[in-house]
């Protein structure tokens, strides 16, 4: 279960997230993938050659978000781990953009198949394998009504997914990236007031976001709302 805290500044409205994300890099994909630590995502650690965590902060000089990738483990003979992770971040952002474009194309085409199974209609979207629609509970629906209802459901489902992808992709594009090597640091060591340098302008900024710390943009007070994800 992941605990995500969404912070909002009471003064300037800046929004920041502390979600305890992890990241992995492996040679096969050459991508640095960040994710919430859940039961469903733990398998991502297997086969990873570089492991670490991600924190989000903000540079008031650049007026940009800064994502800090802290390397905690290097499993294998990789000398330039920081450069490798940075290259993997760039590859991951490009791949995320391609997936977003593909989802938009799938929505645009809206190709479907309809079949009769056990006396009711079933509609599937071949390019969107998770979608399944059946009129099992409403057998009186005509074939045309089933298709119309299924496509409405499909557009609602894929539309929500696209919106989520767009929001995340824009955050990727709006951020600077910093990779630091923490492999020599004890895993349980954590300093909420730790500072880092903005990779763009060199300004000293907080590495973490927390309700105990002032807003990194205006110095005002930030308030957090905690959410749990299974």
List the model feature ranges, each with a label:
Residues 32, 52-64, 211-221:
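Cysteine-rich micro-motifs
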Residues 2-5, 52-55, 191-194, 211:
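Short metal-coordination and nucleic-acid-contact micro-motifs, chiefly zinc-binding Cys/His arrays
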Residues 1-6, 228-230:
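His-enriched metal-coordination microenvironments in redox/metal-binding proteins
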Residues 130-149, 206:
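A short, exposed loop/beta-hairpin motif centered on an aromatic-Gly-Thr core
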Residues 9-12, 59-62, 101, 115-116, ...:
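Short cysteine-rich clusters marking metal-coordination/redox-active sites
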Residues 11-56, 68-90, 182-184, 197-206, ...:
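Short recognition patches in nucleic-acid-associated and regulatory proteins
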